[in-house]
């Protein structure tokens, strides 16, 4: 049996930055550091930070007045920001800059009173934060998840209408939704290209390349990770069975029956240490060769907030 590793895989620049912000805040200010929502959607990462003194909460009312709080990579609504200010919380913002870019598009639409349509998954924290940038009662923001949702939209005129997307969606599904939007509202405005981020795009392309060559694709990522779920869906859609798992303990030997080539990739919030532990487990189960696909090189880097950078330099 052979493993082929996808490339690129695992951590993206936004996840790297978010984790660094929590680590540096702990190093400089000491525990506890409060984090609103899991800083990234990965159980291994979150548990590691929790052991070092990070306290993960879902709402700010769980954070004592004046404490340090970090906003997760998924971003937060304006209401959450205002509450943090009112409560005199010291905030470090780990929102991915590519999510912030979408927030700015929504805020611009809100200021102009332009109606906005967000393509995204209902209930996902990124979607909640992005929807929460719109506060103009004269306009409105509407969420669609799929082509079927567009039929339910009853907006009167499309001359003052714009769309944006969650950053971690399926490229293929999103293209279909955008096409349907443009058919229904020919004058709708939107970003020059969709808002799906470079890391999501690159990892989906890598899975395409992988699925063509493999009998099974293993995606390392947590069940609540949007981008990891999309990777597993993509492989399945291409006709290659895919399994989404948290770590090596989840590998089921039964999956490997009649399998010669196993593809392994990781979502943008899954660290390489988990990939290597899965590779080790698969070697125990009979894998004797490991190859790596050549893929596009990623050199994106996002700085941490200045206050954490100054201390880092010392």
From Swiss-Prot:
Pfam families the record matches: LYTB
Record bears the keyword Signal: no
Cofactor(s) this protein cannot do without: [4Fe-4S] cluster
Catalytic residue list: 126 (proton donor)
Keywords, sorted A to Z: 4Fe-4S, Iron, Iron-sulfur, Isoprene biosynthesis, Metal-binding, Oxidoreductase
Residues binding dimethylallyl diphosphate: 41, 74, 124, 225-227, 269
Residues the record lists as binding [4Fe-4S] cluster: 12, 96, 197
GO biological process, one term: isopentenyl diphosphate biosynthetic process, methylerythritol 4-phosphate pathway
Broad enzyme group: oxidoreductase
Superkingdom as given in the UniProt entry: Bacteria
Binding positions for isopentenyl diphosphate per the UniProt entry: 41, 74, 124, 225-227, 269
Binding-site positions, (2E)-4-hydroxy-3-methylbut-2-enyl diphosphate: 41, 74, 124, 167, 225-227, 269
Signal peptide boundaries: none
HAMAP family: IspH
Function in brief: Catalyzes the conversion of 1-hydroxy-2-methyl-2-(E)-butenyl 4-diphosphate (HMBPP) into a mixture of isopentenyl diphosphate (IPP) and dimethylallyl diphosphate (DMAPP). Acts in the terminal step of the DOXP/MEP pathway for isoprenoid precursor biosynthesis.
Family membership: Belongs to the IspH family.
Protein name, per record: 4-hydroxy-3-methylbut-2-enyl diphosphate reductase
